[in-house]
Amino acid sequence: VNRAAFLDSGIFIAVLSRRDRLHAQAVELFGRAETPWVTSLLVISESCSWFLHRHGEEAARNLRAFISALTGLTILGVTLDDHKRTLRVLDRFRGAKLTYVDAASLGWIELRKINTVWSTDHHLGLTGAEIL
């Protein structure tokens, strides 16, 4: 069992958006120094796009700075094998309206046996991981 927490775009939005209803909880979660984190380039891309299009370039730059400052963060690249696994996840959960990024994340969560996901998206619990 992997003790790392998988970070989804929702947790980045919550921690950096003071008006977000989960902001205080997200700040508390990131205050847990003992937690190793995992996310993917797909999640980072999705998060950067969200901040850029909703709050502008400076907000997207702030996200990039926040992510760069996370010591102990593992960022997963994307391979053709990851793409194939993502397609299998999309087929497996057909009807759940999963985005490609969420399906890729579910694939990595299962592959790496990650039991904890920091997210605001219930879809990332489809494989049994706990959503915080």
What do these predicted ranges mean?
Residues V1-T39, F51-F66:
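Short, well-structured N-terminal submotif of metal-dependent ribonuclease cores
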Residues A4, A103-L132:
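Acidic, metal-binding active-site segment of PIN/NYN-like and related structure-specific nucleases
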Residues G10, L42, A104-G107:
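Active-site phosphate/pyrophosphate-handling residues
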Residues F12, I44, L124-G125:
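A generic structural signal for short hydrophobic patches within well-formed alpha-helices
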Residues G31, A65-T71, D91, E110, ...:
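Alpha-helix boundary recognition
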Residues P36, G72-T74, E130:
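Conserved beta-strand segments of alpha/beta enzyme cores
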Residues L73-V117:
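Active-site neighborhoods of divalent-metal-dependent phosphate/nucleic-acid chemistry enzymes
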